[in-house]
UniProtKB/Swiss-Prot annotation:
<protein>
    <recommendedName>
        <fullName>CASP-like protein 5A1</fullName>
    </recommendedName>
</protein>
<keyword id="KW-1003">Cell membrane</keyword>
<feature type="transmembrane region" description="Helical">
    <location>
        <begin position="122"/>
        <end position="142"/>
    </location>
</feature>
<feature type="transmembrane region" description="Helical">
    <location>
        <begin position="49"/>
        <end position="69"/>
    </location>
</feature>
<feature type="transmembrane region" description="Helical">
    <location>
        <begin position="77"/>
        <end position="97"/>
    </location>
</feature>
<keyword id="KW-0472">Membrane</keyword>
<dbReference type="GO" id="GO:0005886">
    <property type="term" value="C:plasma membrane"/>
</dbReference>
<feature type="topological domain" description="Cytoplasmic">
    <location>
        <begin position="182"/>
        <end position="185"/>
    </location>
</feature>
<feature type="transmembrane region" description="Helical">
    <location>
        <begin position="161"/>
        <end position="181"/>
    </location>
</feature>
<dbReference type="InterPro" id="IPR006702">
    <property type="entry name" value="CASP_dom"/>
</dbReference>
<feature type="topological domain" description="Extracellular">
    <location>
        <begin position="143"/>
        <end position="160"/>
    </location>
</feature>
<feature type="topological domain" description="Cytoplasmic">
    <location>
        <begin position="98"/>
        <end position="121"/>
    </location>
</feature>
<comment type="subunit">
    <text>Homodimer and heterodimers.</text>
</comment>
<comment type="similarity">
    <text>Belongs to the Casparian strip membrane proteins (CASP) family.</text>
</comment>
<dbReference type="InterPro" id="IPR045009">
    <property type="entry name" value="CASPL-5"/>
</dbReference>
<keyword id="KW-0812">Transmembrane</keyword>
<dbReference type="Pfam" id="PF04535">
    <property type="entry name" value="CASP_dom"/>
</dbReference>
């Protein structure tokens, strides 16, 4: 019989097979996993949802600030805009998955699904960090080296860059915790 397996699994400890007692080693492992993952912002948890919403909001603010600037022809700023759009889409998609997992009371413990989360978080974190660093370098050049902040909205650039770094920081936390979860599956 061909039956598909769900990507989300029930939350909780599975019962012992065949009415047999769970060996002490297994009980200790289950307790350790419960203690390690309880309250951590992992995929499918309320903390994970809050982390994803924080990533989304900070990337959205960075995007909104960059869009509100009339003229930005520097490549680093265009890259920041593209990276924040990608970050918004990725964080929003995973927030929707977290909401679904919370509504159906399921845990996202599938190794394939978690590995996709890890790779996606790693890629978006790298892109967001690179874009924020490149944009910060351009703002330092404009503001400090050639003193052109009077004709350029440096404060808006700085606000967008700060929000991009905040988004990167939250994605990095998510990446590390999800990678740790993948290593323990």
């Amino acid at each position: 019989m061909n039956v598909s397996h769900p990507a989300v699994h029930p939350v909780g400890v599975p019962p012992a097979l065949g009415g047999q007692a769970v060996p002490p080693r297994m009980r200790m492992r289950v307790r350790m996993e419960y203690l390690v993952f309880q309250g951590m912002p992992l995929p499918g948890s309320l903390g994970g949802l809050m982390l994803r919403l924080g990533q989304f909001c900070s990337a959205l603010i960075a995007f909104s600030v960059m869009v509100s600037i009339r003229d930005f022809s520097v490549t680093a700023f265009c890259y920041l805009l593209a990276a924040t759009v990608l970050q918004c889409l990725w964080s929003l998609a995973l927030a929707v998955i977290d909401v679904y997992a919370l509504l159906v009371k399921r845990s996202l413990r599938n190794p394939l699904l978690v590995s996709i989360f890890v790779v996606g978080d790693g890629v978006t974190a790298t892109l967001t960090f690179a874009a924020a660093c490149a944009s910060a370098g351009v703002v330092v050049l404009i503001g400090n080296d050639i003193s052109m902040c009077k004709s350029n909205p440096c404060a808006n650039y700085e606000a967008a860059i700060i929000m991009a770094f905040l988004s990167w920081f939250m994605v990095s936390i998510s990446f590390v915790l999800t990678f740790w979860m993948l290593a323990t599956l």
